[in-house]
């Protein structure tokens, strides 16, 4: 476009603007519906790179609506457009403002852009609507509400690509028809249509004269053909204020209402809103009177509206006019009319006119009375009353009441102290009744003067906050003159630890409450001094009403507290009595700890306080600390050449899962009526108590036996550690077993370990220190258990009986329960032994006696749920231990049973090897099955053992401080003496029929056997363990009996040397290494 054409275009636009301003006839609207903030925006399709369609005025006015409508949004107040196309660079994709683009498509700060400017891009950059801002036409419609009357100048700062703006009805859209199709007017307020192959100037404007309070239709149409899109919109108000981009508070939308007849206001300058109201009133005239009154009101949209009120007065009937005369104090006659509504006898309401004539009263009918009041000036009022004269006629009397300020005697002045720094005066009015029964107003003037310095008290208190807090509390104290006085207490709270604050209340002879803070230093159990704050509150009381009492308590410091009680004296009057309670720390012996099992999953600690009366007759508080620990399963382990099997059993009644030997299955089906004995054993820092608890933790004991072999499994309390074994056996190895269980309340999962104690065995003395006291109590009973027998992967269950022994051990406040099942056997053993522990290196003397005898017990045998009772002999084992003068007695009953176990046999192939040459033979074998449960997973272990012909018997006995076991295997004899720290375990042992068929398996035991007499040193770690012996057939062992004899001879020599001097020990070690 040339410069000449450009100038002509601007002149035309200016001329059109002047015409609009001069005419002042822009059409406005007054929609009656509910207005909504913002404008509605409709989106229409526009072809990419179409640079001709948007240059058509008809298209920009209404032709766009023929295109595909893409959607719409509402409530938009920020109506400017500023869209930037994306730039895809090596550093990422970012919107690039048009003013930052350069060269052959590059963007400042991002470098060269690899994408094209001439393609369509989708985004929600236009009013949140997902479309292609690069090529689109949109229409904005709404109502502009001018806040002032005057000229409004709208402006497009720049246009890219084409836009128009129209203001006014019949130009933008018709009133109350915002959502209708666009009208065909091309009389644009701002014409920003881009000419064909040309450009537009900046800052295109259009001016409209608008009247405040009217709604003017506003429409903006914008088209973009490619790439960037720009349309900043602003308006300048008559007062010079400019609104840019955000038009909130200026643009609104209304729903269409085509039926509203008065929606369009063609010329607001001559528009007036008026209403006519007609009212009818009765009057005393004889004709109808009509009058008109004009008022101006403001309507809801802020417009002034003229209101015409037509008043019609009609004559009332004579009977509805009432005239009344009243005297008054004026000097002239006053007439007034009052209108009331009365209901006649016909039930119809009728207007009644009351004419009130007030005439001046005669001087004699006027009464004047004077009353005092609390005001500061004289008040005069008139009251009208009616009196009846001597002639019986009523007469109006006027009473003039003059209220004068009250005399000085009715004014009371009181002075009160207060904590302010200036004098405060206030007036309070009260009503009192005089002797004449009449109420009288009394004025009380209260003067508050600053109190003297002595009435302000400052106290410091500790608190648990992290900063210093200052507050003021007002209290009232009564002095000796009986007058109340305000006292100000300034409380300063300083941070301190929570546990070091003590508050005590003390009576005193003063007349007010005194609060003070005392700081003392106490030394804690760690030896460190700590500041303690004691808040002392002293309350007034008579000297004789103070009582002090001292009580013991379990704290580590002295506590003083004050308790207030009310007593009634002989005069019947209540009196406050102050009781000062001083609690002093009790001795350590008044704190008792007890441990109880419970079914919870955690350890619970609670404290119970009881009061006991000592020998001096004084009550003393005793603190009982109750520790409840959960009962859990006890783990037992079986060590063998094939590894370790761990099983755990927890049940409300004992369950035995036997590990069968390779040569048979043991089934016990009898029960023993329980008898119990209570004993005690003192050991290091442990308290042992025993009781039968069916729901407590149980330990599963493995049982091994043959059909012709019986076993005795005593329950014992013994020691293990370094042990000396004297063995006479023809076997090539030894066997040992014990039961290991964890303390369920121990903080670790290791085996229980106790400090060493002194024990004595034959031919050996050992010295060690004794720990603090431990007590053991054991009780026994019988129960029915389920025995599972398996063959060829088929298992059956049967009911059997066993003796149940339960013991509890308390170490450092942690209690462990041990349960033992003692099977009923046929072995009879009667033997007594004695052991003596001598005092060495200052340790205490201990004497251990073990006796075994037989007695008769009642046995219940059950089969197919039918039980019978028989009398049977039983072995009674008794052990006593004396440590520090405390004796522990442990008794075990094991019945002598005649029950034989049932076995199952099958044919197996036996491979025998000698000197590297192996041969296979077929032999009958006993099949047994063992089960192990780990984490609720059950594993079945079958064992096949070729049958043997030898028989053996086993007898064992228990010793509290020592353990001595005698094993009969043909001509073999085994004696074991054990010295170690005290360990609690249940011992179960059986022997097989073969003298060469015993295999020892213990992770911490080294044993050497010989054919003759062999001295074997066994070293065992401090533990509580469980071992179950297993047998191995002679045919499965490598080597001949000759070789075994030769090795045993070396072993015998080595063991003999071990008991000699140091040189002998060295030689013995070489011999053992050769073996």
UniProtKB/Swiss-Prot annotation:
Residues 1-24 form the signal peptide. A lipid is attached at residue 1052 (GPI-anchor amidated glycine). Sequence repeats lie at residues 278-322, 323-367, 368-412, 413-457, 458-502, 503-547, 548-592, 593-637, 667-686, 687-706, 775-825, 847-897, 898-948. Residues 322-345, 367-390, 457-480, 547-570, 702-762, 959-977, 1016-1026 have a biased composition (Low complexity). Extensively O-glycosylated. The GPI-anchor is attached to the protein in the endoplasmic reticulum and serves to target the protein to the cell surface. There, the glucosamine-inositol phospholipid moiety is cleaved off and the GPI-modified mannoprotein is covalently attached via its lipidless GPI glycan remnant to the 1,6-beta-glucan of the outer cell wall layer. For many industrial applications in which the yeast S.cerevisiae is used, e.g. beer, wine and alcohol production, appropriate flocculation behavior is one of the most important characteristics of a good production strain. The ability of yeast cells to flocculate is of considerable importance, as it provides an effective, environment-friendly, simple and cost-free way to separate yeast cells from the fermentation product at the end of fermentation. Cell wall protein that participates directly in adhesive cell-cell interactions during yeast flocculation, a reversible, asexual and Ca(2+)-dependent process in which cells adhere to form aggregates (flocs) consisting of thousands of cells. The lectin-like protein sticks out of the cell wall of flocculent cells and selectively binds mannose residues in the cell walls of adjacent cells. Activity is inhibited by mannose, but not by glucose, maltose, sucrose or galactose. This is Flocculation protein FLO5. It comes from Saccharomyces cerevisiae (strain ATCC 204508 / S288c). The gene is FLO5.
